[in-house]
């Protein structure tokens, strides 16, 4: 019998420790061990890998990650109430679970993960999920310290991550994710899977870093996409004026029509715009 089989049911753990999901922390607990196992497997083979988990709560996904062979799990939990429940999981997997009490937005795990393959697998707290993803996608240098991200989001956010040009969901997040990773929605999760059930469907997204994304300065790409999507209904000849360079020259040099709108430009197009913008800005600075 595995250590997972020896652990008490999650509902008993929650009841015994008096746990309830806190809306202020963006919590929704996953109690179905078949589902947590499916999330863990969506990240790929875990044998020998170090896994970073954010927001483990009572430890449902944590159990699955360890049972499926993760060499080590580093779990970051802000909610002090969950620490005793996680300690029980740690006792069943001696030396394999490290729980860090803190805010995932402030904890730098890079010094902790060591050498070898590192994956991030998490049912993210919804109130910080997008901020965490942007932080991971903005990692410097690139390729990053993780080999994949397997993350739960609200479905609307997941669709924004994987959106294609021309769709309503396509925006800055899709450009950043598409530039640095290949991303796909692995599967959807119904509200009934959570305690308490959220009002919306959730989705698990799997992202794999590109080893050699198109050369581009992240800061330039951020400025261009912010300007373009900040006024997404306007033509680029208007929306990009806030960049402070010759918009006509910028668009002509990159082969983009002045009448195009942000949602029509693919990731490669935004990279070209960002690189040309950086050159024009640098030239303007030198001239000054």
From Swiss-Prot:
It is found in: Cytoplasm. Its EC number is 2.1.1.182. GO terms for cellular component: cytosol. InterPro entries: KsgA/Erm (IPR001737), rRNA_Ade_diMease-like_C (IPR023165), rRNA_Ade_Mease_Trfase_CS (IPR020596), rRNA_Ade_methylase_Trfase_N (IPR020598), rRNA_adenine_dimethylase (IPR011530), SAM-dependent_MTases_sf (IPR029063). It comes from Xanthobacter autotrophicus (strain ATCC BAA-1158 / Py2). It holds the Pfam family RrnaAD. This is Ribosomal RNA small subunit methyltransferase A. It catalyses: adenosine(1518)/adenosine(1519) in 16S rRNA + 4 S-adenosyl-L-methionine = N(6)-dimethyladenosine(1518)/N(6)-dimethyladenosine(1519) in 16S rRNA + 4 S-adenosyl-L-homocysteine + 4 H(+). PANTHER family: DIMETHYLADENOSINE TRANSFERASE, DIMETHYLADENOSINE TRANSFERASE-RELATED. S-adenosyl-L-methionine binds at residues 28, 30, 55, 77, 103, 123. Keywords: Cytoplasm, Methyltransferase, RNA-binding, rRNA processing, S-adenosyl-L-methionine, Transferase. Specifically dimethylates two adjacent adenosines (A1518 and A1519) in the loop of a conserved hairpin near the 3'-end of 16S rRNA in the 30S particle. May play a critical role in biogenesis of 30S subunits. One of its GO terms (molecular function) is 16S rRNA (adenine(1518)-N(6)/adenine(1519)-N(6))-dimethyltransferase activity. It is an enzyme of class 2 (transferase).
């Amino acid at each position: 019998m595995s250590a997972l089989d020896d652990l008490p049911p999650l509902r008993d753990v929650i009841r015994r420790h008096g746990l309830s999901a806190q809306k202020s922390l963006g919590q929704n607990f996953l109690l179905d061990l078949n589902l947590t196992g499916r999330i863990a497997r969506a990240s790929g083979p875990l044998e020998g890998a170090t896994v970073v988990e954010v927001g483990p709560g009572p430890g449902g996904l944590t159990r699955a990650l360890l049972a499926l062979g993760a060499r080590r799990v580093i779990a970051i939990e802000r909610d002090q109430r969950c620490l005793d429940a996680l300690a029980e999981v740690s006792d069943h997997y001696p030396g394999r679970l490290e729980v860090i009490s803190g805010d995932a937005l402030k904890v730098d795990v890079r010094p902790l993960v060591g050498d070898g393959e590192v994956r991030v697998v998490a049912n993210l707290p919804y109130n910080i999920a997008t901020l965490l993803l942007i932080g991971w996608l903005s990692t410097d240098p690139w390729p990053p310290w993780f080999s994949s991200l397997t993350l739960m989001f609200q479905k609307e956010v997941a669709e924004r991550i994987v959106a294609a040009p021309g769709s309503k969901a396509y925006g800055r997040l899709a450009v950043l994710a598409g530039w640095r990773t290949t991303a796909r929605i692995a599967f959807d999760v119904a509200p009934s899977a959570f305690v308490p059930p959220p009002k919306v469907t959730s989705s698990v997204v799997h992202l794999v870093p590109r080893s050699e994304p198109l050369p581009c300065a992240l800061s330039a790409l951020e400025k261009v996409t912010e300007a373009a999507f900040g006024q997404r209904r306007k033509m680029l000849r208007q929306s990009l004026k806030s960049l402070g360079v010759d918009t006509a020259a910028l668009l002509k040099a990159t082969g983009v029509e002045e009448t195009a709108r942000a949602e029509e430009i693919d990731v490669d197009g935004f990279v070209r715009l960002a690189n040309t913008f950086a050159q024009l800005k640098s030239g303007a600075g030198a001239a000054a």
